[in-house]
Amino acid sequence: MSQETTATKQEEQKTSELQQQKKEEQKPQQATTTTKEEKKTKPEKENFEMVINFRRVIMGRKTTRTKRAIKYVRYMVKRHFGAEKVIIDPLLAKAITMNGRDKIVRRVRIAVKRIGEKTYLARLAIKSE
């Protein structure tokens, strides 16, 4: 019996060693995929239209909704385009507060245009009929 148990233990050790070798062989293949630095770079976009939903902004206090909506537009443009500076068109700000300072619109369609290196202009997108 003792010989049988030692033989099974040796077989188990061999199989575990083979499994470890297989795992080590697979690790370098996974490491050669995209790195964090490659993921951080955003693709360059010249002109782009997007719809921003202000649901998060509307949830909060009434008196600061306009300010938060403008900040949220900046945040979304920075997030999608990798911009450092975002310029908001006054017409867009007026469209957000069309119903009043406390009752902002639910969503707005904006057109984003690149005007410099990492500088973008966010303006109201007007549908052509």
UniProtKB/Swiss-Prot annotation:
<dbReference type="InterPro" id="IPR023621">
    <property type="entry name" value="Ribosomal_eL31_dom_sf"/>
</dbReference>
<comment type="similarity">
    <text>Belongs to the eukaryotic ribosomal protein eL31 family.</text>
</comment>
<dbReference type="GO" id="GO:0005840">
    <property type="term" value="C:ribosome"/>
</dbReference>
<dbReference type="InterPro" id="IPR000054">
    <property type="entry name" value="Ribosomal_eL31"/>
</dbReference>
<feature type="region of interest" description="Disordered">
    <location>
        <begin position="1"/>
        <end position="46"/>
    </location>
</feature>
<keyword id="KW-0687">Ribonucleoprotein</keyword>
<dbReference type="GO" id="GO:1990904">
    <property type="term" value="C:ribonucleoprotein complex"/>
</dbReference>
<feature type="compositionally biased region" description="Basic and acidic residues">
    <location>
        <begin position="35"/>
        <end position="46"/>
    </location>
</feature>
<keyword id="KW-0689">Ribosomal protein</keyword>
<dbReference type="GO" id="GO:0003735">
    <property type="term" value="F:structural constituent of ribosome"/>
</dbReference>
<protein>
    <recommendedName>
        <fullName>Large ribosomal subunit protein eL31</fullName>
    </recommendedName>
</protein>
<feature type="compositionally biased region" description="Basic and acidic residues">
    <location>
        <begin position="9"/>
        <end position="27"/>
    </location>
</feature>
<dbReference type="Pfam" id="PF01198">
    <property type="entry name" value="Ribosomal_L31e"/>
</dbReference>
<dbReference type="GO" id="GO:0006412">
    <property type="term" value="P:translation"/>
</dbReference>
